[in-house]
């Protein structure tokens, strides 16, 4: 049971403390595709305002998932195509191959490591 909807728990924690991803405010947003059932692992989405006043779309994912980049690009296009795209996931799940995919988008995106238990976030460089 503790493995279900971990990405939603991550979104909840970050929406309560948006500074973890460099945001002033965040709220849950509709994903570009919905989960078909409770066991299906699908990233979830929030939108808001960054600490610099820019509109942002944040994608929450747990585990290494190359498909998260396409999911995020679709979500940004659906919510606000001009928004900055941020992927929030546990630091251990940020891998070079996936960050390169995010950098290759027409409007690049970045990853932020969010380690919920330690309530720390570090931008991936």
Protein language model annotation of sequence segments:
Residues 1-125:
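Charged, terminal alpha-helix-loop-beta segments
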């Amino acid at each position: 049971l503790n493995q279900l909807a971990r990405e939603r728990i991550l979104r909840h924690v970050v929406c309560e403390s948006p500074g973890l991803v460099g945001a002033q405010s965040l709220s849950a947003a509709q994903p570009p595709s919905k989960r078909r059932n409770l066991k299906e692992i699908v990233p979830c989405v929030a939108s808001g305002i960054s600490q610099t006043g820019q509109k942002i779309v944040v994608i929450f994912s747990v585990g290494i998932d190359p498909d998260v980049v396409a999911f995020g690009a679709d979500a940004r296009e659906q919510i606000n195509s001009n928004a900055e795209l941020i992927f929030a996931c546990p630091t251990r799940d940020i891998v070079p191959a996936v960050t390169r995919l995010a950098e290759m988008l027409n409007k690049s995106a970045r990853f932020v490591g969010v380690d919920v238990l330690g309530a720390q976030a570090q931008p991936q460089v």
